[in-house]
């Protein structure tokens, strides 16, 4: 029975009549009179059988091909256009295009409870990565991973049987493969290639385990939107390479390449010259760092609801695209992608299952808006989570919170770790309490910085009496530190990616772990210049991340130092004496 003046939604399955990737390419490249391709539902028995036969025939008809690049297996991430050919909704991690009556019937039989459309629709939010995932949606994801893995394994076995290698493109129809989950290791994939938009998306590829090699497709694509008389492909290529290089120096991919229409690139000889330069630089880099672990000053754990499943993709709506609402948080992940830390991603369930998971962690980072999957939402109502995190810090661990860490209104607090961070958010409930802690203080964390860019920042944050304020603007705290037991906490309202902010984060990690004395080890006094060391290979390098000459003092691992001048974008390799 409907109630008058109430809103209702109607849930339904819509058949995809035009494959979203084909539609995207047609719209982007202004294709005319091209037949619309449909998406194969390879999970259907007849289509499944046909696809395997078609794969064998393709291999037989193309004996000169020795690597098959699958694009991909088998479900497209959520990508919807409107009636005006404009992009309407996109979620690079979206599962809503991976459903069909056949699949849903299988799901019900396996999990033992009826499927409801709301498990996918999720009030219209479609379980995007900002939503705290429900048990039912996580069950569906796990089911999809298992079923996708079975068919992928069949296809890679055929590929190997025919003497070929199987490569997967990390993009387009990749939903269900989930490279950081256990099922991926069963796929039989030889290699993974993916698009590199920045350091985070580079690590999405290079951190994948269980393959023989990884490859990054650098930008720009050889498409008319860049390769035209008004475009500057060299400028875009330089920015892309320097951004990706930071991450490559921490965890290298094995190969690099480009994609698009080659005839367009041929019209820009200066671009070809720069690509040659990049290739030569990559060869030297790869020879020096492959097979070794770079020096890591600390082990950092990013804590959210997704853990390793969304490693390096936190706060990413579309592939490496800017969003005003999240760049102040995504900057943390981007900084970590090229920083000298051992970075892991854990979720709250990991802590419940094994509290000892925190024993070898130096610093926990919780970053994002309140009541999102990135900060935890209702997970903070679980006393075992509170006990584990508070105990970790109290006994000497470090914690860094960005935005609204542990933000969830519950039992008299908005920040559930307010006494740990030493800050709280004014939501109106505590307006009657006077606040007297507003004085700013100099601090180790800010010694390299002039004025910190907090991005969008946060309003209405105030300090508790125990906290030390580093930056406040109009009585709104932007950065503060706090001692909690033997441990230390750092609060930052936001930290967009920049070289200066990466230095702020680096110093915050050192301070939170009582490691200020470790600053001058494999260190550059100029935050535009990075130092990466590879003790196993007796190599280290100094990298200028800018288009301008830089002067700096370089500290080696033993604390000795030397002065250095670098040319724009230059990388210099040294032997460790």
Where are these regions (language model features)?
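Hydrophobic targeting/anchoring helices
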Residues: 56, 69-72, 77-80, 130-131, ...
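Short acidic/histidine-rich motifs immediately flanking catalytic phosphotransfer sites
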Residues: 357-364
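A short, well-structured beta->alpha microelement
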Residues: 168-177, 333-357
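Polysaccharide-binding and catalytic clefts of secreted carbohydrate-active enzymes
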Residues: 4-186, 204, 290
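A short helix->loop->beta-strand "cap" motif at the edges of active sites that frequently abuts
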Residues: 163-164, 212, 395-398, 487
